[in-house]
């Protein structure tokens, strides 16, 4: 346990939050990704000693890493996401819980609210077996004893992003891809919350220089 809240980047969109001994991971992708990587992941799933929860923003495999989540299932108490993601995690035998957008739940002393996201890129491509819904994707607004942390997840810019309680920390995705917040949207968010610390997310991990989603 620590007497404060510590945040560590895990590569790509993944973060570890240790808030006075309560430990969460958001979108950990620590093994088994299907593209070349630029970095060595800071920890292997088998070496994680304990997690109170894993939070997953959506189903893309650079956010919901099945190999990572299943290998940590013996040391992770619970997994949280949207209802659709809950259905996917249940098939892997994970102790998962689904929530609606706007719903709040608690993990220890941390209060967590699902924020909206718009990332239904799959609907633009043939071959998927379902029509994806906006509510299948989310972000997380996490109120810790030491401050407010916002993980937006993957999303196009939404006006609601400027109407949040002012976060102290934002996991900042400023990829200029059409299905991400984009540079213009990122600037709006930074200007809306000038006191927030911006921790860069979704960059510097996947070796795909021609793919905007993986590059700022």
Model-derived segments and spans:
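Pre-active-site segment of Zn-dependent metallo-hydrolases
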Residues: 10, 14-59, 66-71, 121-131, ...
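Conserved catalytic scaffold of divalent metal-dependent phosphoesterases
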Residues: 22-32, 99-105, 109-120, 156-157, ...
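Active-site neighborhood of phospho(di)ester-bond hydrolases with catalytic His/Asp-centered motifs
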Residues: 25-27, 50-62, 79-82, 150-153, ...
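Cap/insert and terminal regions of metallo-dependent hydrolase folds
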Residues: 80, 84-87, 156-216
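Active-site-proximal loop/helix segment associated with metal-binding centers of metalloenzymes
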Residues: 113-146, 160
């Amino acid at each position: 346990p620590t007497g404060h809240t510590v945040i560590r980047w895990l590569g790509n969109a993944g973060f570890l939050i240790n808030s006075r001994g309560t430990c969460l991971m958001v979108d950990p992708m620590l093994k088994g990704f299907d593209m070349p990587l630029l970095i060595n992941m800071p920890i292997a799933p088998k070496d994680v000693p304990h997690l109170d929860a894993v939070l997953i923003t959506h189903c893309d495999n650079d956010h919901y890493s099945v190999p990572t989540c299943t290998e940590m299932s013996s040391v992770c108490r619970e997994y949280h996401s949207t209802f659709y993601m809950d259905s996917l995690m249940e098939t892997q035998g994970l102790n998962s819980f689904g929530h609606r957008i706007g719903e709040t739940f608690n993990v220890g002393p941390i209060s967590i609210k699902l924020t909206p996201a718009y990332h239904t890129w799959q609907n633009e491509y043939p071959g998927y077996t379902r029509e994806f819904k906006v509510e299948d994707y989310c972000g997380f607004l996490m109120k810790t004893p030491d401050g407010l942390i916002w993980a937006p997840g993957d999303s196009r810019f939404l006006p609601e992003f400027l109407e949040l309680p002012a976060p102290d920390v934002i996991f900042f995705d400023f990829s200029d891809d059409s299905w991400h917040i984009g540079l213009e949207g990122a600037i709006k968010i930074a200007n809306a919350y000038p006191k927030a610390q911006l921790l860069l997310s979704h960059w510097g991990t996947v070796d795909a220089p021609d793919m905007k989603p993986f590059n700022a």
